[in-house]
């Protein structure tokens, strides 16, 4: 009828207590009722360019299984980010061609080939770092090939995870660098442990999503 959802097994409420009805898309929940637990490994060079994506279930031990293919083969180094529903892979290195600006995405809960999301706004970017939350994916730093002086970049760029489209400019790191590995909370990203042209850098940069 038109009475709306019914909760079975609840007969009375004591005082001001009650139950919290689940809300939001069921895409945010695993089919078995557990927590989010899938990892996806993509791309590589062996020595040719690889488009393979494998997946693992983090809660259990075992070999990876085939998930699907990237839009084209390339080496991807620490340039993946994810929300609860999507995984994005941005940039990478193509043997014989150079760096890639492509962004691919997949739906984590289902296997299948990657879809085109858009492009990074720096066409020759690799060895960059990334941070992400449920809303934004952010890439920062990178090595420019061919390695013109200084061969690294300080650019920060972002995408909105739930949409598709090219990356937009977010801002700049405090200096040019590559390998700016990132960690994040739901509200803040931190980049540290970077390498400049010479020598390595101990600088730590923070940003708010």
For the regions a language model picked out, list residue spans one by one.
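Polar, enzyme-active/binding microenvironments
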Residues: 1-209
């Amino acid at each position: 009828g038109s009475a709306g959802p019914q909760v079975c097994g609840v007969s009375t409420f004591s005082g001001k207590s009650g139950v919290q009805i689940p809300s939001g898309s069921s895409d945010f929940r695993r089919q078995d009722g557990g927590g989010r637990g899938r990892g996806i490994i993509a791309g590589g060079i062996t020595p040719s360019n690889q488009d393979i994506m494998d997946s693992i279930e983090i809660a259990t031990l075992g070999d990876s299984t085939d998930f699907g293919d990237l839009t084209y083969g390339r080496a991807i180094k620490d340039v993946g980010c994810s929300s609860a529903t999507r995984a994005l892979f941005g940039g990478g290195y193509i043997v014989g061609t150079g760096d890639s600006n492509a962004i691919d995405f997949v739906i984590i809960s289902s296997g299948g080939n990657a879809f085109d999301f858009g492009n990074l706004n720096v066409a020759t970017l690799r060895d960059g770092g990334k941070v992400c939350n449920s809303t934004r994916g952010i890439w920062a730093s990178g090595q420019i090939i061919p390695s013109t002086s200084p061969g690294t970049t300080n650019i920060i760029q972002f995408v909105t995870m739930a949409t598709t489209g090219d990356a937009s400019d977010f801002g700049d790191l405090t200096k040019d660098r590559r390998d700016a590995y990132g960690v994040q909370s739901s509200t803040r990203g931190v980049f540290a442990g970077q390498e400049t042209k010479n020598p390595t850098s101990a600088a730590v940069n923070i940003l708010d999503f």
